[in-house]
């Protein structure tokens, strides 16, 4: 079929087709041209709740062994030089430390909730320790 020149005709009052905004047109054409898909992100708090459930289920130690052992040796240097530790002694210290910290954070969370907050703050830790009688 041969192309013919179109002539202008008078409108009959129907709605005129809208012009698309430049941004909308660009947005539609970008993925078609092999655009990079942005990575999936979870809503704030979702990953935190998943981690809470995961760590509450688990029983493994959460502090790495080597850094904890270095800390123990550094503290022990103040009392006596050239101290030697059995590996089971360091493990027992680590178990006790982690149990203490977990309990302290539980009490700290209760202090934050009591203050009608969900974020723990240093003042919550101080209050928890004061109530426990560890610090005046």
Curated annotation (Swiss-Prot):
Localization annotation: Nucleus; Chromosome
Protein name (database record): Histone H3
Coiled coil: none
PANTHER family membership: HISTONE H3
Residues recorded as bearing N6,N6,N6-trimethyllysine in the entry: 5, 10, 28, 37
Region of interest: Disordered: 1-43
Native source species: Caenorhabditis elegans
SMART domains attached to this UniProt entry: H3 (SM00428)
Database matches in Gene3D superfamilies: Histone, subunit A (1.10.20.10)
């Amino acid at each position: 079929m041969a192309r013919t020149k179109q002539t202008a005709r008078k409108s009959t009052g129907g709605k005129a087709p809208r012009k698309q905004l430049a941004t909308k047109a660009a947005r539609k054409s970008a993925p078609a041209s092999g655009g990079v898909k942005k990575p999936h992100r979870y809503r704030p708090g979702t990953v935190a709740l998943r981690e809470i459930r995961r760590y509450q289920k688990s029983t493994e130690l959460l502090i790495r062994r080597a850094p904890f052992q270095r800390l123990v040796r550094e503290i022990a240097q103040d009392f006596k030089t050239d101290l030697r530790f059995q590996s089971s002694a360091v493990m027992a210290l680590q178990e006790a430390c982690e149990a203490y910290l977990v309990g302290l954070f539980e009490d700290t969370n209760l202090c934050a909730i009591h203050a009608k907050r969900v974020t723990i703050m240093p003042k919550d830790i101080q209050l928890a320790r004061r109530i426990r009688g560890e610090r005046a």
